[in-house]
């Protein structure tokens, strides 16, 4: 499955200049959709007594508003919420800010 250009541009990397978004999109490789459908048993993961952090990118519209936070983040139990501006693809559009948030998340 390859993400159509319009979906990529409008929902996943809308904070990048169009030339950057297109350059990255042209390098994407199709991947099987089955990985998105497989059910995983995560009971053991959720029961781990480790610190958990969630980096919430405020403009992430990949799955619609609220999908990642609070819907997915609420599964973590107690966690630190770290927020930043950016789309789903902040590793391309805001790498320095993302690196800072990862360091902050690891500081528990």
Name what the model sees in each region:
Residues 1-12, 61, 87-94:
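Low-complexity, flexible helical/coil segments
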Residues 48, 105-108:
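Glycine-rich phosphate-binding loop signature in dinucleotide/nucleotide-binding domains
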